[in-house]
């Protein structure tokens, strides 16, 4: 499966497309620990908890059952997801953070190329939860990078005003 996604500049919603047809979305509310995602009529909820060492639980919205979890590897831009006792690793594939992969036992199940307002993902699995989770992790690290930039540049900007 090959998906494209787009996100408007100040939007919290990623729209997912398959051959130009909308097939899902990932909605990330600002200042909320809960995000929702849907793909091919399957809906998932992502609940992030913790402060310095955050984790995310993945729920099937229809059954309200926990189907997986995500553990982040700090600022190293790597995450581990677990579904049914199977471990998956999400990681960037280049130093520009414009390509990432979602792997099981060193085999890439999902690969993606990013642009400023979207990207393209190729999935070698029919499990939609893996693809939507990989997109969620990508968004998590983009938000983390933005927060770090704000934390660094606001003091610099404030010092330059004085």
Could you say what each language-model-derived stretch is?
Residues 1-33, 39-41, 62-66, 75-162:
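Low-complexity or membrane-interfacial segments used for flexible interactions
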Residues 43-74:
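Short hydrophobic interaction/assembly module
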